[in-house]
């Protein structure tokens, strides 16, 4: 059952005597060939092979006199490949030392300085009042007290607190002797 062909439509804008040219439908082979051509053109739209590594080839614009430096190159200082016996030493003027060497304090002077330290006194007062110090202040107190102990040991100075401990130990020894002997008045 074939259907009848439709009558060709007339172009409204064109005069009645002129007919529009009928477009011919492309065959499958022609469509495939055009698609391959489009694909081939699309495939070659990027840079050519090696364009990233061969910078010189892509930058040829007729500037043969001025060579552009490769931006990927690091240091501009030439590296000697052979060790030469004559090494040219660059003589640099020695900087003038403006630093005045601080005189080193004797242990007695350093101990006196640390014992009269106002910051240490204030921090120790805060500790006596049961205040909590931050890490920096606590570290300062610890370091300073350790240094004072080391200086006192070096100078042979002992703290006066040891006398109370000695008296307590003597009292305990006396009590132990009394218990062992049984009679406090028995002496040799």
UniProtKB/Swiss-Prot annotation:
GO MF: GTPase activator activity
Domain of life: Bacteria
Biased composition (Polar residues): 47-57
Region described as Disordered: 1-80, 162-188
Keyword Ion transport (UniProt): no
Biased composition (Basic and acidic residues): 27-37
Keywords noted in UniProt: GTPase activation, Ribosome biogenesis
GO biological process: one example: ribosome biogenesis
Listed InterPro entries: YihI
Subunit structure comment from the entry: Interacts with Der.
NCBIfam families, sorted: PRK05244.1-1
Free-text function comment from the UniProt entry: A GTPase-activating protein (GAP) that modifies Der/EngA GTPase function. May play a role in ribosome biogenesis.
Similarity comment: Belongs to the YihI family.
Name of the protein this chain belongs to: Der GTPase-activating protein YihI
Lineage: Bacteria, Pseudomonadati, Pseudomonadota, Gammaproteobacteria, Enterobacterales
Gene that encodes it: yihI
């Amino acid at each position: 059952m074939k259907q009848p062909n439709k009558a060709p439509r007339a172009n409204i804008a064109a005069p009645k005597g002129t007919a529009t040219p009928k477009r011919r439908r492309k065959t499958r082979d022609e469509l495939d060939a055009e698609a391959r051509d489009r694909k081939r053109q699309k495939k070659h739209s990027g840079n050519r092979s090696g364009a990233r590594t061969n910078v010189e080839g892509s930058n040829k614009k007729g500037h043969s006199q001025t060579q552009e430096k490769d931006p990927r190159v690091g240091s501009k200082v030439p590296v000697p490949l052979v060790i030469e016996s004559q090494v040219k030493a660059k003589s640099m003027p020695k900087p003038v030392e403006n630093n005045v060497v601080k005189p080193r304090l004797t242990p007695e002077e350093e101990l006196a300085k640390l014992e009269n330290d106002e910051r240490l006194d204030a921090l120790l007062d805060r500790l006596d009042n049961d205040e909590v110090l931050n890490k920096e202040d606590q570290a300062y107190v610890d370091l300073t007290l350790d240094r004072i102990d080391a200086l006192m040991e070096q100078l042979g100075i002992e703290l006066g607190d040891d006398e109370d401990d000695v008296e307590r130990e003597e009292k305990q020894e006396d009590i132990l002797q009394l218990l062992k002997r049984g009679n406090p008045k028995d002496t040799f």
